[in-house]
Amino acid sequence: MSKNLLIELGLEELPAYVVTPSEKQLGERLATFLTENRLSFEDIQTFSTPRRLAVRVSGLADQQTDLTEDFKGPAKKIALDADGNFSKAAQGFVRGKGLTTDAIEFREVKGEEYVYVTKHEAGKPAKEVLLGVTEVLSAMTFPVSMHWANNSFEYIRPVHTLTVLLNDEALELDFLDIHSGRVSRGHRFLGTETTITSADSYEADLRSQFVIADAKERQEMIVEQIKTLEVEQGVQVDIDEDLLNEVLNLVEFPTAFMGSFEAKYLDVPEEVLVTSMKNHQRYFVVRDQAGHLMPNFVSVRNGNDQAIENVIKGNEKVLVARLEDGEFFWREDQKLQIADLVAKLTNVTFHEKIGSLAEHMDRTRVIAASLAKEANLSAEEVTAVDRAAQIYKFDLLTGMVGEFDELQGIMGEKYALLAGEDAAVATAIREHYLPDAAGGALPETKVGAVLALAAKLDTLLSFFSVGLIPSGSNDPYALRRATQGIVRILDHFGWRIPMDKLVDSLYDLSFDSLTYANKADVMNFIRARVDKMMGKAAPKDIREAILASSTFVVPEMLAAAEALVKASHTENYKPAVESLSRAFNLAEKADASVQVDPSLFENEQENTLFAAIQGLTLAGSAAQQLEQVFALSPVINDFFDNTMVMAGDQALKNNRLAILSDLVSKAKTIVAFNQLNTK
């Protein structure tokens, strides 16, 4: 008869960002433990709050399944001595399996007999197996951990309780310095210690103590309460998904409420108000039906609605202090001059090994000018790029950004417009930070995109030049994100800028502040980001073939990868790749100094292939170019069928290899076909 298992770990308050991943990890680790220990089950449900992680297993088997395993030992000729008795090798083998030589039998494998033993292990009761379940808890990993009391072990937070129930029976286990039982803790202020009656009564027992154990249910409660406030007040609430996920992991019993602030603060830029509410206070933003910001907010209390008026007043008071700061900085920053702030950037360190922020900006300006030409920007856009590159970090020295660093770039745009800067310049100041996260928004303007590329390129080259190169998962300066941004921007705008030539040109630049170094490492790093951009949809051989092509133009490489993936599912892919791969491999033997001499052709197939190569223009999309190359496959095969490439005559051999070399020089601009796998 199956049973239900409950495990709850009661902890000190957890950081919100670790709650959901830890809940998931607990469920996955327990499922693995049960599977490895041959305990079948029907379902696993996980629970979490800021003060507990829990999991319930439904339909858990009463005992392990029996195990029967066959083990192969030494060959018969080794297992028996000259007298036909079992040798020490055979005896040692069975002893290691906990058996005797009586269990030995011989089985033939590929014409030779070997020792085999069969071991039967009866399944243990589930209750006995579960005594080892604390290894699941011990194996949990967290981004941070701590010691407490006089203990030598570390964990995410101090552990207060451990509840392990098999149906309604409490199992006795020890974890860290805690002995398990059936006692759990209710809400920190509204509840008390409580007894969990059974695995099935878990949610109900905690609910009576003002704890909603199911995170999904808490989320639904929060959303429903906010929707009710929307209807009652006739407003719209921005239910930001990230904020919602954070808030639900800050409360055990949610109660949403609406507060307000004076309308005068709406004169402050919306971004300042939203940042104050959302990022600093974890409040939801309120708008009218037209989408305009209102002097209200929605917050979620960790508790019921008792004395909610006092809670609202307290939250309003805290927010007003933030808004006062924002209003003050908004007013005072407008008195500052951009030129004065830029001049002070010489005293702001970009990195102690690299130099000042002003020096970083100087290098960025030079790179931006070069990129503007490569991207064929208009004269007006070139002027805007140059101006933006001179001032784009000035807002870092404003009071607002000093207080709300999330607003860097955003306030730069606003202050630049107030100072009379061109709109394209102001927008570029904001957009040069983009994308600011994996998959984040990209610059929308060419001016902003060029400035973003230039700033990211100097950041990448500067850090690599002083040896600050990411290793493993360690990337403290977010260079992977910056480089991924470079790749995404180039692809988004379709700028066909050869990265190898661009980087070469940057290394030719001379700056008093820094000399770029470690070019090979930089190129490999960029290649790795392009590889990542090609994604899991492109198999490893396709990605490697693209990266080994002779062209390093990001949009073309990504398009070629997509085209190759689609082509790989067609009938002519395998024969076309095989003929091209053969041509690529032979072309490696060609003498680069030899030019094709048509007078040395001995058959029609040589002439036909040479003419086809001469006519190969590789125009259109990546898919169209791929089709053009694949169309040569029959011609290449005819050539190989009727021509001895490695002829005894040196002149003929060199001429035929030169034909193939001409083919490869064109085809390799798309893909290194000999890197593709057709097996």
Swiss-Prot record:
Catalysis performed (reactions): tRNA(Gly) + glycine + ATP = glycyl-tRNA(Gly) + AMP + diphosphate
Transmembrane domains' residue ranges: none
An annotated Gene Ontology molecular function: ATP binding
Domain of life: Bacteria
Key words, A-Z: Aminoacyl-tRNA synthetase, ATP-binding, Cytoplasm, Ligase, Nucleotide-binding, Protein biosynthesis
GO biological process: glycyl-tRNA aminoacylation
Gene (name only): glyS
Protein name as catalogued: Glycine--tRNA ligase beta subunit
Pfam families: tRNA_synt_2f
PANTHER family hit by this protein: GLYCINE--TRNA LIGASE, CHLOROPLASTIC_MITOCHONDRIAL 2, GLYCYL-TRNA SYNTHETASE
Major localisation: cytoplasm
EC number: 6.1.1.14
GO cellular component, one term: cytosol
Subunit structure: Tetramer of two alpha and two beta subunits.
Keyword Nucleotide-binding among record annotations: yes
The organism of origin for this protein: Streptococcus pyogenes serotype M1
Root EC class: ligase
Family, as annotated: Belongs to the class-II aminoacyl-tRNA synthetase family.
Compartment annotation: Cytoplasm
